[in-house]
């Protein structure tokens, strides 16, 4: 019975069953060539042409080039449209202004602008040209409140008109 099954599978119905063995198997090897043709990659030696540094850059900002601590007065609080009701909130705002002012001391000479963090992908910027015509009035009709052809955004937690505190 086994003999007849082998004859059935070796028949012309399955011509791919009798494919020729690869050359390295014909030589009596067990399934793999003696030496691999693939090379190992040393991942530490890979260098990519990238604007993004391979290691984090921690610039040292000296205390002389950064501005001194800017005091937050009532006018600054009013412009922020956020009511600072405690001394801790005042300190937090002063700390944020001091932290943000460090950007003034960063030297950006010779640094190309980065349009996208995915610099290996192609970024096609469209031309800046008007394509829809003059639709300013149509857009402004969607606004709840407008002032001199501008949208009026809702204020923060402080009213725009304030009575002076006594």
From Swiss-Prot:
InterPro entries: Asp/Glu-ADT_sf_sub_c, GatC. It comes from the Eukaryota. Its main location: mitochondrion. It is found in: Mitochondrion. Its EC number is 6.3.5.-. GO terms for biological process: glutaminyl-tRNAGln biosynthesis via transamidation; mitochondrial translation; regulation of translational fidelity. One of its GO terms (molecular function) is ATP binding. It catalyses: L-glutamyl-tRNA(Gln) + L-glutamine + ATP + H2O = L-glutaminyl-tRNA(Gln) + L-glutamate + ADP + phosphate + H(+). PANTHER family: GLUTAMYL-TRNA(GLN) AMIDOTRANSFERASE SUBUNIT C, MITOCHONDRIAL. Allows the formation of correctly charged Gln-tRNA(Gln) through the transamidation of misacylated Glu-tRNA(Gln) in the mitochondria. The reaction takes place in the presence of glutamine and ATP through an activated gamma-phospho-Glu-tRNA(Gln). Belongs to the GatC family. This is Glutamyl-tRNA(Gln) amidotransferase subunit C-2, mitochondrial. It comes from Culex quinquefasciatus.
């Amino acid at each position: 019975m086994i003999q007849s099954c082998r004859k059935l599978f070796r028949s012309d119905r399955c011509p791919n069953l009798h494919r020729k063995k690869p050359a390295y198997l014909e030589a009596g090897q067990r399934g793999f060539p003696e030496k691999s043709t693939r090379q190992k990659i040393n991942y530490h030696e890979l260098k990519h042409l990238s604007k993004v540094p391979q290691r984090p850059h921690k610039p040292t900002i000296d205390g002389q080039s950064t501005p001194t601590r800017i005091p937050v007065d009532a006018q600054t609080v009013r412009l922020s449209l956020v009511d600072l009701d405690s001394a801790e909130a005042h300190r937090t705002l002063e700390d944020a202004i001091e932290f943000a002012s460090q950007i003034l001391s960063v030297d950006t000479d010779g640094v190309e602008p980065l349009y996208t963090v995915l610099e290996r992908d192609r970024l096609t910027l469209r031309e800046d040209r008007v394509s829809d015509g003059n639709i300013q009035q149509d857009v402004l009709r969607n606004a709840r409140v407008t002032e001199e052809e501008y949208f009026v955004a809702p204020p923060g937690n402080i009213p725009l008109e304030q009575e002076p505190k006594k």
